């Protein structure tokens, strides 16, 4: 049972699943500490509001200025249109909510949308910036915004090492993709950097990490801002189990039916024998890269489970899926319950794009990683996975950005059965323990959440 309700908080995530999920998870934690939450999703599709049965969380959509017939990624290109329309919609929503029987006290917003801070301040709300990505990438973006780091004109002509507080030296290949080369992602470069344009006006700053994971970076950050690290916000079943009904990222009223076929297939494999491959919901690999991965998997001879979206399946080699099924050596699935998969005893390693949510999930469940980073924060995450936390290895690319089948296979074998793989398993088990301690009762992140609740009541 949750405590008597103490306050009402609005959540405003950037409308991508990787940003929405950490917001939902924090709302669940706050619900059990007596806070009522409203999740506001900017969308071109109107949905009727609904309230979760298990939590005091209501979900509303507001219009983002786009229409159903437009490309789903249009909002990521026409940023001004998204900003202007969503600003109006958010202002109207908050103004109306303040007239309700349970008016909100605070807005927790994604810094990808700094305009939300200005709106909330104008409407007299306590304003909280919530970074759903790690400090690793955010610190780089901060220094670009401050002018203390210059993005090179050409990453290949200027391969100098970059230095940031609390970081090891970073090569150009270790930096977030938006920080590697001027002009490569002009709109998105501005988008991620302007997170810091008004951050000092926030009343509180949260991040989906934990103190023990990024200690040197966290120390520097704490000297700059009122930072509270409240992660990892992975569903409670896979961490402290204090919210036994919290088994996935969905809310009770929006749950999809689980696909038991994947877990049944894994149940017939020996312990730590399966290579799990997944590249998230946004990454679209080239056909050439997909074929290199497929050949690498076949070359290693390990059982494999590969999550491949329907839109990507045509990039696989002809006959690859059928051959795997015929030999019972692998399974290519359109969707998998990733947390359940990573928690399964049959999984030996995780071949991943190193997105932050996937990285935290692997770390929390003690699964070694083979990193194949693509863009955004992923290269920096991969650097820390391999060289700082030492919980995986990173696949290298050639001059054209392609990872060869030989390189991918080498890394998989190294993690699955090499001497380095043994050390990696020890290291990821240590971090697994630290992650669970942080979010468990009395842990560093749990204390930060309690401190945050106290600010709201």
From Swiss-Prot:
Keywords: Glycosyltransferase, Transferase. One of its GO terms (molecular function) is UDP-glucosyltransferase activity. Its EC number is 2.4.1.-. The keyword Glycosyltransferase applies. GO terms for cellular component: peroxisome. It comes from the Eukaryota. Transmembrane segments: none annotated. SUPFAM superfamilies: UDP-Glycosyltransferase/glycogen phosphorylase. Gene3D superfamilies: Glycogen Phosphorylase B. It is an enzyme of class 2 (transferase). UDP-alpha-D-glucose binds at residues 281, 336-338, 353-361, 375-378. Belongs to the UDP-glycosyltransferase family. This is UDP-glycosyltransferase 74C1. It comes from Arabidopsis thaliana (Mouse-ear cress). The gene is UGT74C1.
